From Swiss-Prot:
Residues 2-160 form the Obg domain. The lineage of its organism: Bacteria, Bacillati, Bacillota, Bacilli, Lactobacillales. Monomer. This is GTPase Obg. Residues 360-438 form the OCT domain. Disulfide bonds: none annotated. HAMAP family: GTPase_Obg. It comes from the Bacteria. GO terms for biological process: ribosome biogenesis. It comes from Streptococcus uberis (strain ATCC BAA-854 / 0140J). Belongs to the TRAFAC class OBG-HflX-like GTPase superfamily. OBG GTPase family.
Length: 438
């Protein structure tokens, strides 16, 4: 059996845009040819795409860094550099992508073929043909390509199943799945025989079908990490109906009703919304001695918790080993599924607000910040300013002068004066230093 991996931490980096080119038209019989440098190509984006053939996040165990290629540089004759192809990263259905730093959900990928641009490629820098004006018909200005986005991500796989089997270890969940579907889970007479989720397709005699997941057994304290802990509790989140399997024979020496209460407490502690899912109680091992007496006591205790206006969960006595009582259980499960809508896995507050693709600067975006370093130099920072800086070709005087005009237009010079900067003070942006001229 292949190893199951349902969480992974990875980093992605989109490709940088290609640099624009400074070039001039030099052809015989064409006097004063003017600028002819083309734009750089767009950097490749990193795109997640759902592949229904994948079952785990195992591929991300050994490959944790994904980097798209940069765009090509601009060329002469005003030709654009070639844009890089996007990097397609395949993920299984049910993959939730979160920002590793904030923990916020970026996207939830559940449909086969669904795509999401997780890191946008940088745009290509403009060539000098773009900067020609009547006042400067032969500019020696070109932009560097824009850096691609970089992100640290957490991936979580929550299997897609209509029905989830929950219960203590060794209550018969794996046996139930094996007799109602073609799934072949590992079955044994010891705790935690099931250590990975198993998925099977169930078809009732009435013709209804649904996906059922056998999840590793829970024990008291699972929501705090005891036993297999929360490692597989996340897989219950996508289910619409929960089959709560109870060992009515009390073969492990536990009270069946206390088992029922304990497991529900773990579900509630892990995620309060899990108890919103309708449950069917599967009273298993009814072929064992004293099971009938235990079931009668169970029903009495359960009824005491509900008043006449509450909908008490249905109880189905079965024996998975003897294959008794299963048809009525499956029909009831199919009927409950038909009347139960999908549950919203995340609300709006769980999602991280993603910026739109926008190559200007939003009004809300803070243009720059000024701090003072230990060596008394002034340090400029800020997303807008740093983006302008990295796209400026510092090897060409005209580009540097253009950058200086941009800083002045942003109010950097005035802000430095207000902070007390004097003529000759050192100003730093990244690893680039220059003197402040008042």
């Amino acid at each position: 059996m292949s190893m199951f991996l349902d969480t992974a931490k990875i980093s992605v980096q989109a490709g940088r845009g290609g640099d624009g080119m400074v070039a001039f038209r030099r052809e015989k019989y064409v006097p004063n040819g003017g600028p002819w440098g083309g734009d750089g190509g767009k950097g490749g984006s990193v795109i997640f795409k759902v592949d229904e053939g994948l079952r785990t996040l195992m591929d991300f165990r050994y490959n944790r860094k994904f980097r798209a290629k940069a765009g090509e540089k601009g060329m002469t004759k005003g030709m654009h550099g070639r844009g890089s192809e996007d990097l397609i990263v395949l993920v299984p259905q049910g993959t939730t992508v979160k920002d590793a730093e904030t923990g916020k959900v970026i996207t939830d990928l559940v449909e086969n073929g669904q795509e999401y641009v997780i890191a946008k490629g940088g745009r290509g820098g403009r060539g000098n043909i773009r900067f020609a004006t009547p006042r400067n018909p032969a500019p020696e200005i070109a932009e560097n390509g824009e850096p691609g986005e970089e992100r640290e991500l957490e991936l979580e796989l929550k299997i897609l199943a209509d029905v989830g089997l929950v219960g203590f270890p060794s209550v018969g969940k794996s046996t139930l799945l094996s007799v109602v579907s073609a799934a072949k889970p590992k079955i044994g007479a010891y705790h935690f025989t099931t250590i990975v989720p198993n998925l099977g397709m169930v078809r009732t005699k009435s013709g209804d079908s649904f996906a059922m997941a056998d999840l590793p057994g829970l024990i008291e304290g699972a929501s705090q990490g005891i036993g297999l802990g929360t490692q597989f509790l996340r897989h219950i989140e996508r289910t619409r109906v929960i089959l709560h399997v109870i060992d009515m024979s009390a073969s492990e020496g536990r009270d069946p009703y206390e088992d029922y209460v304990s497991i529900n407490n773990e579900l509630e502690t892990y995620n309060l919304r899990l108890l919103e899912r309708p449950q069917i109680i599967v009273a298993n091992k009814m072929d064992m001695p004293e099971a009938e007496e235990h079931l009668a006591a169970f029903k009495e205790k359960l009824a005491a918790e509900y008043d006449e206006f509450d909908d008490m969960p249905q109880i189905f006595p079965v024996s998975t080993l003897a294959k008794q009582g299963l048809d009525s259980l499956l029909d009831a499960t199919a009927n409950l599924l038909a009347s139960t809508d999908e549950f919203l896995l995340y609300d709006e507050s769980d999602y991280q607000v993603e910026d739109e693709v926008y190559y200007g600067f939003s009004e809300e975006e803070k243009a720059f910040e000024i701090t003072r370093d230990d060596d008394a130099s002034w340090v400029l920072s800020g997303e807008k300013l740093e983006r302008l800086f990295v796209m400026t070709n510092m090897e060409r005087d005209e580009s540097i002068m253009k950058f200086a005009r941009q800083l002045r237009g942003m109010g950097v010079d005035e802000a430095l004066r207000e902070r007390g900067a004097k003529d000759g003070d050192l100003v730093r942006i990244g690893n680039f230093e220059f003197e402040f001229v008042d």
